[in-house]
Amino acid sequence: MRKFEKSSKLDNVLYDVRGPVVDEANRMVEDGMEVLKLNIGNPYPFGFSAPQEVILDMLSNIRTSQGYSDSKGIFSARKAIMQYSQLKHIPNVTMSDIYTGNGVSELINLCMQALLDNGDEILIPAPDYPLWTATATLAGGKVVHYICDEQSDWYPDIEDMR
């Protein structure tokens, strides 16, 4: 059987959603410790569920939802986002400005691929969700972290950005 090597594009990519940090957390759970696992970004295990209205809408539309949506996303969802933007007095948001996706991971990846050229620097807060750093690196960007300190209510340190 032919052996496949990982791409060198992954050499500088760290993604601790899996790997040694998760392995250590699992070991701690096995030792009887309580570990709050926030590494996947799934709110459901923490008691956050979709509102009943959304669940009912999903159920009533399941028969008509068996294909691909428009590449920008479902029209009614995009319209609702535009209307919400208007309610919040966010100027100049039009339907053509709004894209939806299958979750934030897909959209972060699309944005990084579309906006970063090789060697472009991108400011990313630290601590960060590792997907930001991983996708920026894979897109050819050079990640520059700036500190958000808990003692400062997580506000960024402007001097650190310079």
What is each stretch, according to the model?
Residues 1-8, 116-121:
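Long, low-complexity, intrinsically disordered polar/charged segments
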Residues 2-5, 11-103, 110, 157:
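N-terminal small-domain helix-loop-helix segment of the aminotransferase-like
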Residues 5-8, 63, 142, 149-151:
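Residue-level signal for pocket-adjacent positions within structured domains
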Residues 42, 75, 105, 129, ...:
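Residue-level detector of flexible, active-site-proximal loop/helix-junction positions
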Residues 79, 109, 130-134:
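Alpha-helical elements of the RecA-like P-loop NTPase motor core of helicases
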Residues 96, 114-162:
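PLP-dependent aminotransferase-like
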